[in-house]
Amino acid sequence: MSTAPLYTVVVPAAGIGQRMQADRPKQYLTIAGKTILEHTLENLYAHPQIEQIIVAINPLDQYFDSLPIASKTWVKRVDGGGERADSVLAGLNSLQNADWVLVHDAARPCLAQDDLSKLLATAEHSEHGAILACRVRDTMKRGNSSHDILHTESRDNLWHALTPQFFPLDALRSALGQAMAQGIEITDEASAIEWVQGKVHLVEGRSSNIKVTQPEDLHLAEFYLQHKATL
């Protein structure tokens, strides 16, 4: 009987979360007695195929080292950069002897374990990367700079990109490096792979896998965390 492969997750956590309008970076805000970052890391490590998490932290960060989770043997800290892509690349460059790697947002604490399992299973039958995503359900409008509607976009084949995103390590590291060297804006790892004409598969996941961005998201994330066994 073969053993399931083990993987490392890179978590970029060097951002300051200005939209949250809080007194600290959003990953250090508390939900249900723990910081968002602690929920995120513990949730990832709870999966039996995750063996290590590399957290990219702002070098001037004053919060991470005081968290109990910072001393866990399965957590490795690296210095992050000014942009998400810089932090992800720092995490990737610290990796050795890995074929595949996951990248997950620090502010997504509500990832479902079976969604993560579905994503990891793609490595068993594909040489390409994949991301968790959920289908667009609302009517989508294209607007102009004056906030006037130009037209309605078709929802067919439109998806919300989520994380984790899962790629061969060398392919992702190369794509990020090339895109950054050309000054391309990288909003997620898939966009770097797309830029080098790589193939990325969509794995449907739950819409409850939200990214905490606005103040009202804190209450929604707390609800999902408290009810994750039934969602």
UniProtKB/Swiss-Prot annotation:
GO biological process entries: isopentenyl diphosphate biosynthetic process, methylerythritol 4-phosphate pathway
Keyword tags: Isoprene biosynthesis, Nucleotidyltransferase, Transferase
Sites marked Transition state stabilizer: 19, 26
Enzyme Commission designation: 2.7.7.60
Keyword set includes Nucleotidyltransferase: yes
Described purpose of this protein according to its UniProt entry: Catalyzes the formation of 4-diphosphocytidyl-2-C-methyl-D-erythritol from CTP and 2-C-methyl-D-erythritol 4-phosphate (MEP).
Family matches, as HAMAP family: IspD
Full protein name: 2-C-methyl-D-erythritol 4-phosphate cytidylyltransferase
Gene: ispD
